[in-house]
Amino acid sequence: MLNRSIHEITLPLKVIIGSNILDKIPDYLLKMKLTNQYKAGIITGPTTYNVAGKIVEEAMKNNGYIVEVWKARDARIETANQIVEETKKHGIKIFLGVGGGKSIDLAKYAAYKNNGYMISVPTAASHDGIASPFASLKGTSKPTSTPTTTPYAIIADIDMISKAPPRLIRSGVGDLLGKLTAVKDWQLAHRLKGEYYGEYAAQLALLSAKHVIRYHELIASGNPDGIRIVVEALISSGVAMCIAGSSRPASGSEHLFSHALDLLAPGKALHGEQVALGTIMMLYLYGDPKWKKIKRIMKKIGLPTTAEEIGIPIETIVKALTIAHKIRPNRYTILGEKGLTEEAAWRLVRETGII
């Protein structure tokens, strides 16, 4: 029987993907009825401001917008709350997150708290936060995502994103590979715990993973067409979360493992690199032979597949595996409610060649 409860879905109004389009942002805003009667705030970073933020600022000012700029060095909750207060004082209504994950997460949070319009302008394709209604803020009581607002629009300049370090693109692919286990975990929670499961959102998330698997060689070549595939897949994954109303289709046991690593070895590796490594191991736990194929693809792309390559001691990886289930106790996954024993974790890293 169909679930008759009310399920509200908020999707981005527009997704614009092209090359050399940052200076056209005012035109796009105008088409969305976001005229220069609204004050705009650009949330960016010191480096990304010089690369992209400055272009957006000048284009906005040339079109009569009053613009304030925030150059944040981190995405801690204290920084986020400070930006919330300052943007409120300035009467900001259009929040442009220009940069990587930190800038976009801060802009989403500020827009959410101020009931504004959030415009996602990624300069890298390193994870699916560019389109999701969640933000990853450090310093909160839990190392998981915070609900925010769905981006009102996503404006992705492929030319700009192509100039980002290749490692960031690879990280984006790693985040997408994680959907393979995230959806399995969601299905498991549905069967064992009666949790809501949305087939459409699940299939959309899986499609984003399958898309990068299919075109992994093109992506590895650094071709702009490959970059575009990663960007589109990351946006699809973000939209899957919007449809589900949670991060379930995009975040499962592989993300719990990554969050555990964030606690034990902060800043050692990129989010997508950690997620991809977790995906290999979680697929193995499911008895899915696909883990070998995923590992081969990761090697081809240049993603780390061992503890040595990711730069984290194997003892830390084992510890992360044993505490991952505690990160988000209400999120049921293949790790179960009691998690892995240390012995089981060591066996897992040996069997999958992480050690």
Curated annotation (Swiss-Prot):
UniProt keyword terms in alphabetical order: Cytoplasm, Lipid biosynthesis, Lipid metabolism, Metal-binding, NAD, NADP, Oxidoreductase, Phospholipid biosynthesis, Phospholipid metabolism, Zinc
Gene Ontology BP terms: glycerophospholipid metabolic process; phospholipid biosynthetic process
SUPFAM superfamilies reported for this sequence: Dehydroquinate synthase-like (SSF56796)
A Pfam cross-reference name: Fe-ADH_2
Gene3D superfamilies registered for this protein in UniProt: 3.40.50.1970, Dehydroquinate synthase-like - alpha domain
Gene Ontology molecular function, alphabetical: glycerol-1-phosphate dehydrogenase (NAD+) activity; glycerol-1-phosphate dehydrogenase (NADP+) activity; metal ion binding
Reaction catalysis annotation: sn-glycerol 1-phosphate + NAD(+) = dihydroxyacetone phosphate + NADH + H(+); sn-glycerol 1-phosphate + NADP(+) = dihydroxyacetone phosphate + NADPH + H(+)
InterPro entries to which the protein is assigned, alphabetical: G1P_dehydrogenase_arc, G1PDH, Glycerol_DH
Binding of substrate, residues: 128, 175, 259
Residues that coordinate or bind Zn(2+): 175, 255, 271
Pathway(s) served: Membrane lipid metabolism; glycerophospholipid metabolism
Record function comment: Catalyzes the NAD(P)H-dependent reduction of dihydroxyacetonephosphate (DHAP or glycerone phosphate) to glycerol 1-phosphate (G1P). The G1P thus generated is used as the glycerophosphate backbone of phospholipids in the cellular membranes of Archaea.
NCBIfam families: PRK00843.1 (NF002022)
Record note on quaternary structure: Homodimer.
Family label: Belongs to the glycerol-1-phosphate dehydrogenase family.
Name used for this protein in its record: Glycerol-1-phosphate dehydrogenase [NAD(P)+]
Organism: Staphylothermus marinus (strain ATCC 43588 / DSM 3639 / JCM 9404 / F1)
Lineage: Archaea, Thermoproteota, Thermoprotei, Desulfurococcales, Desulfurococcaceae
